[in-house]
């Protein structure tokens, strides 16, 4: 059974009353569990992957798309094969082709790319809806980068603008039970909490279901930490190393696993 456990009453809508459900009824409903594109790491919903420019987040995003489309594990995390749409809006097909050759000899037909799209409030939602209609097995959409689909807003209402934009994409993800991952940037100013470094107001990070921050201690290093936090996943820090030959971020350690082993 799906997540809809009561029907909207036209009388309630007419009287402008809240549609509610009591706890006993709610707990008796056999609701559909969340879909996970990557087990315990990336569920259906709206997510942000943030990192400094040229830190390697697009390589990570592309490899994620490839793993999901092939149904191959992302590090130690299982994936389920599905169709994937990657909006690589800062790249060309030539660059994506070159990177695919670096990553694999066999790119699947279930992995789709676009280098141009409409903006968020000017046709993008309709474009995605049409793609999902044509490719109903799609479970993951990556938008690289978030800023490419946004229009300049009023700085005086930056929080409201951030929250509204994320809300539109989250509603789209929830409606179709898919994961949408937004590739984004970090602030230049350091912070003890990596999540506070996500560019923009807390309207972005607060409205998303999960946030991932890819952060190097020094730019020239080939190691980084992926900080992961979200509503439906445990907090974890993944120590990664970028392999310059395979062009893949390889897992060195997972502090969540270490915590479980020591407990």
Range-by-range predicted roles:
Residues 69:
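Gly/Ala-rich phosphate-binding loop of Rossmann-like dinucleotide-binding domains
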Residues 43-47, 82:
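Pre-Walker A (Motif I) flank of P-loop NTPase domains
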Residues 60, 64:
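Hydrophobic positions on the alpha1 helix immediately C-terminal to the Walker A/P-loop
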Residues 14-18, 24, 31-33, 37-38, ...:
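Conserved inter-motif catalytic segment of the P-loop NTP-binding fold
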Residues 1-18:
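Short, small/acidic-rich helices and loops at N termini and domain boundaries
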Residues 48-50, 54, 58-59, 87, ...:
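Phosphate-binding/switch region of NTP-binding enzymes
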Residues 251-263:
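Short alpha-helical segments that sit at the start of domains
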């Amino acid at each position: 059974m799906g997540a809809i456990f009561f029907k909207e009453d036209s009388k309630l809508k007419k009287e402008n009353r809240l549609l509610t459900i009591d706890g006993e009824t709610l707990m008796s409903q056999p609701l559909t569990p969340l879909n996970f594109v990557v087990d315990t790491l990336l569920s259906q919903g709206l997510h942000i992957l943030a990192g400094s420019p040229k830190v390697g987040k697009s390589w990570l995003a592309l490899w994620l798309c490839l793993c999901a489309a092939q149904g191959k594990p992302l590090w130690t995390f299982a994936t389920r094969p599905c169709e994937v749409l990657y909006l690589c809006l800062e790249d060309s097909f030539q660059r994506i082709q070159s990177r695919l050759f670096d990553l694999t000899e066999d790119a699947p037909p279930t992995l789709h790319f676009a280098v141009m799209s409409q903006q968020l409030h000017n046709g993008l939602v309709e474009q995605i809806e049409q793609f999902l209609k044509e490719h109903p097995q799609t479970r993951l959409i990556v938008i690289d980068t978030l800023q490419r689909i946004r229009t300049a807003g009023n700085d005086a209402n930056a929080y409201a603008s951030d929250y509204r934009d994320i809300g539109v994409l989250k509603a789209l993800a929830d409606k179709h039970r898919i994961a949408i991952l937004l590739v984004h940037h970090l602030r230049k100013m350091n912070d003890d909490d990596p999540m506070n470094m996500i560019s923009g107001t807390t309207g972005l990070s607060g409205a998303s279901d999960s946030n991932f921050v890819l952060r190097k201690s020094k730019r020239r290093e080939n190691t980084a930490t992926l900080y992961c936090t979200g509503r439906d996943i445990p907090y974890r820090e993944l120590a990664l190393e970028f392999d310059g030959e395979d062009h893949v971020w390889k897992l060195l350690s997972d502090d969540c696993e270490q915590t479980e082993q020591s407990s």
